[in-house]
Amino acid sequence: MGLLSVDLLITLQILPVFFSNCLFLALYDSVILLKHVALLLSRSKSTRGEWRRMLTSEGLRCVWNSFLLDAYKQVKLGEDAPNSSVVHVSNPESGNNYASEKTADGAECHLLDFASAERPLVVNFGSATUPPFTRQLPAFRQLVEEFSSVADFLLVYIDEAHPSDGWAVPGDSSLSFEVKKHRNQEDRCAAAHQLLERFSLPPQCQVVADRMDNNANVAYGVAFERVCIVQRRKIAYLGGKGPFSYNLQEVRSWLEKNFSKRUILD
């Protein structure tokens, strides 16, 4: 099958879910608009903020590109884990553990540098401006605390899902971040530090940032958020495409299935 035929087939596979996502965004905008109008009629002070639509031309491009990233991703369940180039970000909670000593803040490294031959590596991809990702960070922290005796954990900070100067989302909660598009590696690392200031992670969790060529994002087909588990340099678990298929409960189930309760408590 030629490349043109493959591209056409992938496009036809993407179209139904793409249109369903567009419908969801339209419904979301309708609900928010009705809520906004109701607050205006009630003369509530909470209506002073700007109303932002989600169904925009830039939003459609982002959604479409996210499906393309997922379709063309290199990572496959049971196959070799891509050893993407990343940049180390210091975790304020980390002490002088072995990983921190080997990798200085801002130093270039590779994703599999954090993998152990005997322990699985849980890799969590996301950014501060992705609400589904930030909402799950407390659950991710709990996973690290409960399973760090049997597994290693890595957070990979990627390109912003909803930068304030791009496809921004309404800032209506304490989880909201105002982060612009990353112009350079320093911007990306600064955004990662901003996330860690709001959501502290246990010292057992290492943090890195994707390079500006987004090689980790492309290899793992992340787009918005994704989680996977690497074991013996193979993909032992591959989570679905975020936001709708991003599921940390599946990670917990995998860890519980593969490790006894006694080992976890140890």
Curated annotation (Swiss-Prot):
Topological domains, Cytoplasmic: 35-266
Pfam family, one: T4_deiodinase
Mode of membrane association: Single-pass type III membrane protein
Keyword set, alphabetical order: Endoplasmic reticulum, Membrane, Oxidoreductase, Selenocysteine, Thyroid hormones biosynthesis, Transmembrane, Transmembrane helix, Ubl conjugation
E.C. code: 1.21.99.4
Active-site residues annotated for this sequence: U130
A GO MF label: thyroxine 5'-deiodinase activity
Known catalytic reactions: 3,3',5-triiodo-L-thyronine + iodide + A + H(+) = L-thyroxine + AH2; 3,3'-diiodo-L-thyronine + iodide + A + H(+) = 3,3',5'-triiodo-L-thyronine + AH2; 3'-iodo-L-thyronine + iodide + A + H(+) = 3',5'-diiodo-L-thyronine + AH2; 3,3'-diiodothyronamine + iodide + A + H(+) = 3,3',5'-triiodothyronamine + AH2
Top EC category: oxidoreductase
InterPro entries reported for this sequence: Iodothyronine_deiodinase (IPR000643), Iodothyronine_deiodinase_AS (IPR008261), Thioredoxin-like_sf (IPR036249)
This protein's GO CC annotations: endoplasmic reticulum membrane; plasma membrane
Membrane-spanning intervals of the chain: 10-34
Modification comment: Ubiquitinated by MARCHF6, leading to its degradation by the proteasome. Deubiquitinated by USP20 and USP33.
Residue ranges that the UniProt entry lists as topological domain Lumenal: 1-9
The protein's role, per its UniProt record: Plays a crucial role in the metabolism of thyroid hormones (TH) and has specific roles in TH activation and inactivation by deiodination. Catalyzes the deiodination of L-thyroxine (T4) to 3,5,3'-triiodothyronine (T3) and 3,3',5'-triiodothyronine (rT3) to 3,3'-diiodothyronine (3,3'-T2) via outer-ring deiodination (ORD). Catalyzes the deiodination of 3',5'-diiodothyronine (3',5'-T2) to 3'-monoiodothyronine (3'-T1) via ORD. Catalyzes the phenolic ring deiodinations of 3,3',5'-triiodothyronamine and 3',5'- diiodothyronamine.
Annotated family: Belongs to the iodothyronine deiodinase family.
Protein name, entry field: Type II iodothyronine deiodinase
Gene giving rise to this polypeptide: Dio2
